[in-house]
């Protein structure tokens, strides 16, 4: 059985990608890099990033339809929806396509209610303590990316 793992809002260099690519039955669709954090983008950068992320959602939908995975993991889709980088319509099309073949996992904070009702799994990791908060450390190579 096949697994499709697709990322949103990441730069394609995250540490989990290397590990995931070692799994024979997993197809990894890395995020198309966006320039910086959404909260720090100009209006023009947000518009361009949203176009790119919506196009990526359509590409992932096509990948799911071709691969027919038993499990599709949509990493950070919840965040992409919450910050307006992916439209509800595009997310629904992607989720529906993936659900036709198996289960769907959608990760990230702020999942909208409609997605929580629709997806098979919705997960969110909450940082109770993190050096970013306590020591004002930036993301570190080998740890956060």
Feature locations, PLM:
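Conserved P-loop
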Residues: 1-65
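Conserved ATP-binding/catalytic motifs of P-loop helicase motor domains
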Residues: 6, 104, 131
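Conserved nucleotide-binding/hydrolysis micro-motifs of P-loop NTPases
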Residues: 9-12, 34-36, 78-80, 110-113, ...
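Short, electropositive alpha-helical surface patch
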Residues: 16-17, 22-24, 87-97, 122-136
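Phosphate-binding/switch loop-helix module in NTP-utilizing enzymes
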Residues: 40-100
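Short, well-ordered beta-strand core segments
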Residues: 72, 104, 122-124
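Sensor-1/coupling segment of RecA-like P-loop NTPase cores
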Residues: 94-112
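Phosphate-binding/switch region of NTP-binding enzymes
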Residues: 109-145
């Amino acid at each position: 059985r096949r697994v499709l793992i697709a990322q949103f809002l990441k730069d394609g260099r995250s540490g989990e990608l290397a590990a995931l690519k070692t799994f024979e039955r997993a197809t990894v669709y890395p995020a198309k890099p966006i320039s910086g954090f959404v909260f720090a983008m100009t209006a023009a950068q947000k518009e361009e990033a949203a176009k790119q992320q919506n196009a990526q959602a359509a590409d992932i939908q096509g990948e799911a339809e071709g691969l027919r995975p038993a499990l599709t993991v949509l990493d950070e889709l919840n965040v992409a929806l919450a910050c307006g980088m992916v439209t509800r319509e595009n997310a629904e099309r992607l989720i529906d396509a993936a659900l036709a073949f198996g289960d769907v996992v959608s990760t990230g904070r702020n999942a909208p209610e409609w997605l929580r009702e629709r997806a098979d799994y919705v997960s969110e990791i909450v940082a109770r303590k993190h050096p970013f908060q306590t020591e004002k450390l930036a993301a570190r190579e080998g740890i956060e990316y």
